[in-house]
Amino acid sequence: MGNTYGLEGLGLINPGNIYRNLPVARLVEMALARGEGVLASNGALSVRTGKYTGRSPNDRFMVDTPSVHDTISWGAVNQPLEEARFEALFRRLAAYLQGRDLFIFDGFVGADPAYRMPIRVVNQYAWQNLFVHQLFVRPSAAELEAHEPQFTVICAPGFQATPEVDGTRSEAFVVLNFDRRLIIIGGTSYAGEMKKSIFTVMNYLLPERGVCPMHCSANMGPAGDTALFFGLSGTGKTTLSADPERRLIGDDEHGWSDHGIFNFEGGCYAKCIKLSAEHEPQIWNAIRFGSVLENVAVDPDSRAIDYDCDALTENTRAAYPVDFIPNAVIPGIGGHPRTVVFLTADAFGVMPPIAKLTREQAMYHFLSGYTSKLAGTERGITDPQATFSTCFGAPFLPRSPRVYADLLGERIAKHGASVYLVNTGWTGGPSGIGRRMSLPYTRAMVRAAIKGELEGVEFVPDPVFGILVPTSCPGVPAEVLNPRHTWQDKEKYDAMARKLAGLFAENFTKFRDVPEEIRAAGPVVR
């Protein structure tokens, strides 16, 4: 029998062939030969993930053991699973994998050698192994030789849970076991589950080392200045950080340590619904041989791609290594950020397109994490809905929100970063009536903030939200900056703004131990 690479130590015995860290071309060949996908006209591997075209947050669990019981914030996001249930589920999963070919990726999460974690991902499908090969940090030959994983993901979409036996909610499951340093995934082919489960692990482990883990993108200017972009799925993190005038560090997950910031990943996972070469040339050009397209419409004859088609899902995705973006920062490490941007997709159409935040307002809005759940990023979401996701990443935060807010607040104060709130959502009315914010205008506002061009501009407090709105911005018409001016019916705007202010206040009641100066930094409710 060939090298099993220590899989028997996990409890995986009698596998078929084992393929470890295959090069991209071989993984693409094998995925095609196994009927897992097709080659699109631009060379990317195009796959479909079945009925699960987004994350399935209701199907994610954490094993409740004494070592983590008091440090995990249990609830609807972090659902507990008994240890015995995990072991029984894992035994059946291991039995299912006997005799099947397995694909192993050994690599790292974390670009900074001081904080990176060696990981292993074991896949049933070649295309998913290509995905993790492109998304995580790839090892050198010497690093691979010495690799000893500290956390393992086993992903077998073909294996399904039995809810009444396993204690799950459906046939799909994502279970994190911190004691076993093991994640098991089954019943869903959506590759984002692997990425986000490892992100959750980092969000649990890094605060103990004084590192602030963040759901954000990051880039670097010509002078080495760095900027962060926080926001939930679909708010513009990937799009706005892929700026031809700046160098991309990473598009989704970073840590902020005493030394600066670092990317957790080695790749990008971009939404590509309505992708255009005109508006997002860097992402457009990154989708080529070696990239993976998830649930994107591809003509069966010509293999031409239709990025506008949402027949399978709004949540169409492209995965590619960060070095497919020209001039990306490799390794993904930068200095302390000078600018922090909170992105929100406001479905009510009443938030300003850009506003400056005081330190207290920054903490209020970070804890609130207001945005809209955009169609397709989770199962069951077909129209935008107002939502509050603490720290712009509640689905991935195992600990209390205060842990992450305190870490970020300390970093912002210590390094004097300017914080802006940017609305990439609707203007001139709520979703369905108003229009989506112009991407060129948003880019112009973000560039002005990062370059310091708003520092000398007059700011006026928003009468409802209290945040500081600039009266002018290079490249943006003045009337766009004041959301009330974009509505035909000003009374309807006022009513909608009051409604959203009330939702902010209602949501913030759950933070009982927050200092009064932060609580007072929220919208004025009349």
From Swiss-Prot:
Its main location: cytoplasm. It catalyses: oxaloacetate + ATP = phosphoenolpyruvate + ADP + CO2. Disulfide bonds: none annotated. It comes from the Bacteria. InterPro entries: PEP_carboxykinase_ATP (IPR001272), PEP_carboxykinase_C (IPR013035), PEP_carboxykinase_N (IPR008210), PEPCK_ATP_CS (IPR015994). PANTHER family: PHOSPHOENOLPYRUVATE CARBOXYKINASE (ATP) (PTHR30031:SF0), PHOSPHOENOLPYRUVATE CARBOXYKINASE ATP (PTHR30031). This is Phosphoenolpyruvate carboxykinase (ATP) 2. The lineage of its organism: Bacteria, Bacillati, Bacillota, Clostridia, Moorellales. The gene is pckA2.
